[in-house]
Amino acid sequence: MSYRVKRMLMLLVTGLFLSLSTFAASASAQTGGSFYEPFNNYNTGLWQKADGYSNGNMFNCTWRANNVSMTSLGEMRLSLTSPSYNKFDCGENRSVQTYGYGLYEVNMKPAKNVGIVSSFFTYTGPTDGTPWDEIDIEFLGKDTTKVQFNYYTNGVGNHEKIVNLGFDAANSYHTYAFDWQPNSIKWYVDGQLKHTATTQIPQTPGKIMMNLWNGAGVDEWLGSYNGVTPLSRSLHWVRYTKR
């Protein structure tokens, strides 16, 4: 091989490496960095409220911006209300940016009532032009002495793990967390490891989301919602540590 050919190959390889490095850096820059957010006020640079639509299927309510509010106690409150007979409005808050591997923590109290769910999770999906990847911390209002962990990778779930807490989560604030890494997800309650997953781990960065909603057609999972309103769940702070 001549010197000129070798030189051209070296330049091509170097150019490809630089292009890939630039792409990787760009992809990394598109995800959010570490933050700690106490809910003393609503930070529109970090969060956005779902408003005016329903997820349909098992979600038996319409997301309303008014159902995401801040209290004088330094809390974010997500509410489930009824504007008219058998119609329900619910609350969902989500991050503006997407976030990747790292430690996700929330200090919160779920709502307590049969047929409802209080969630903290990461999500991305087809409407974002990505696979459906999701990592969940969920409280089923029918029994808030337990927490459910779950995750989806390219739409494949069925990884549910229900953990007995030893206390009623609806009565006081506790910290729930998951540490998402390329080869594992570890879930924590008040700093204590409760569950680890190591297979089919999600790879796609997603938005940080939190919501309160009532279900329909999933009575075996949630119990039959009895129409009680208003209901609310509270969040004191959220923290993300990129790593």
Swiss-Prot record:
Phenotypic consequence of E134Q: 0.2% of wild-type activity
Impact upon substituting D133N: 15% of wild-type activity
Catalytic activity: Hydrolysis of (1->4)-beta-D-glucosidic linkages in beta-D-glucans containing (1->3)- and (1->4)-bonds
Impact when changing D219N: No change in activity
The UniProt record lists the keyword Membrane: no
Signal peptide limits: 1-27
Top-level taxonomic group: Bacteria
Record-linked InterPro entries: Beta-glucanase/XTH (IPR044791), Beta_glucanase (IPR008264), ConA-like_dom_sf (IPR013320), GH16 (IPR000757), GH16_AS (IPR008263)
Stretches assigned to the GH16 domain: 29-243
Consequence recorded when altering D179N: 80% of wild-type activity
Disulfide bonds: C61-C90
Database matches in Pfam families: Glyco_hydro_16 (PF00722)
The protein's name: Beta-glucanase
The organism of origin for this protein: Bacillus licheniformis
